[in-house]
Curated annotation (Swiss-Prot):
SMART domains: FBOX. Pfam families: F-box, FBA_1. Gene3D superfamilies: 1.20.1280.50. InterPro entries: F-box-assoc_dom_typ1, F-box-assoc_interact_dom, F-box-like_dom_sf, F-box_dom, SCF_F-box_component. Signal peptide: none annotated. This is Putative F-box protein At3g17265. Residues 1-46 form the F-box domain.
């Protein structure tokens, strides 16, 4: 009996629409698919068509040695209409199965389906692909030790190269500013909230030219907190929060158009959340924007209570929140817009 085979281009197009979580189970089916799923062109196409998962990084109050490192999934279905505050965190998505998992503190960044994790002793970084289970441990060196006589601090920037498994120092670059928040990655570049003595701005690092560039900031108000996020892997979003005597307001800005490598940023005011006067204030750690439903999901830590984290769901003048279980000291719990991928490293 003869089997009819699809043309390779059509077969690749069909498979590129299958979620990576299912493709990883098919890679041992035949040699042709095994090679296809490792083709960078196919992986990029599959990543571009993948659906986004919202995950919440929090080790919770569980023992890491018993439960491994948990990444929680937040179910947003139904929130647009009912806005039910009982909708919260589902305790299931990925577990980090690594013999040294108990040394990992938590996720600090993410890009193209890969999660960057910090270790408790601050001597290594861990790159983790939750979809494939692949991990890589990267050694880092603390150049500056605790020294009371140290009065001059020289900042150097390094790039880690996966192919050579080595660090490379970037010479002759200095943004000459204060970086105020963790960065986000979008279309191969990194973006940070930064400031100098005169103003605040978005600081972009271009990995192609290996240079910093200053971009426009939406508002120069005296906000105490500013956090960046990414919208659909196309736009940047910025959260600003001020602590007034009468109320706490959260201002959400979104870039008007998709990010273009050669253009400055233009911002629009997306949403203003007024929490009113509250006795227990919180500081946003991360947030995600749903443009279509004009909604924001925000992870915050309660001020003066280090180990308590809450999640806010806010839209059109309505806010609800749900408290999350306590987290270990030093662990930063935040929301991640995660897309499963077959990226290899």
């Amino acid at each position: 009996m003869m089997f009819a085979y699809l043309p390779p281009d059509l077969e690749s197009e069909i498979l590129s629409r299958v979620p990576a979580t299912f493709l990883k189970e098919l890679q041992t089916t035949c040699k042709r698919w095994y090679a296809l799923f490792r083709d960078p062109i196919f992986v990029k196409k599959n990543l571009g068509k993948a659906a986004t998962h919202v995950i919440f990084n929090n080790l919770g109050d569980y023992s890491v040695t018993e439960m491994n490192t948990l990444v929680h999934s937040i179910n947003l279905r139904g929130i647009q209409n009912s806005f039910d505050p009982s909708i919260g965190v589902e305790r299931k998505l990925y577990e980090l199965n690594d013999p040294e998992h108990d040394k990992i503190l938590g996720i600090i960044s993410h890009c193209d389906g890969l999660l960057l994790c910090a270790t408790k002793d601050k001597t290594r970084l861990v790159v983790w692909n939750p979809c494939t289970g692949q991990t890589r441990w990267i050694q880092i060196k603390n150049v500056f030790k605790n020294n009371p006589q140290l009065i001059l601090l020289v900042i150097k920037f390094k790039i880690y190269e996966f192919n050579s498994d080595s660090w490379r120092i970037l010479d002759d670059i200095s943004p000459v500013c204060f970086i105020r928040s963790n960065g986000v990655n979008l279309k191969g570049n990194a973006y940070f909230v930064a400031s100098d003595k005169e103003s605040k701005f978005i600081l972009k690092f271009d990995f192609t030219t290996e240079r910093f560039l200053r971009l426009s900031f939406p508002s120069q108000n005296d906000d105490q907190i500013a956090v960046l996020s990414v919208v659909r892997q196309e736009k940047l979003a910025l959260l600003q929060q001020r602590f007034d005597t009468s109320s706490i307001k959260m201002n959400i800005w979104v870039t008007k158009t998709k990010i273009d490598a050669d253009k400055d940023l233009s911002w629009s005011n997306f949403l203003v959340v007024d929490f009113g006067k509250v006795t227990l204030t919180s500081e946003p750690l991360s947030f995600l924007v749903d443009e279509e439903n004009k909604m924001v999901v925000c992870s915050s830590k309660i001020r003066h209570i280090e180990r308590k984290t809450i999640i806010y769901f806010a839209k059109e003048g309505i806010q609800v929140h749900q408290e999350i279980a306590q987290k270990p000291k030093g662990c930063c719990s935040f929301l991640v817009s995660y897309v499963p991928s077959l990226v290899q490293f």
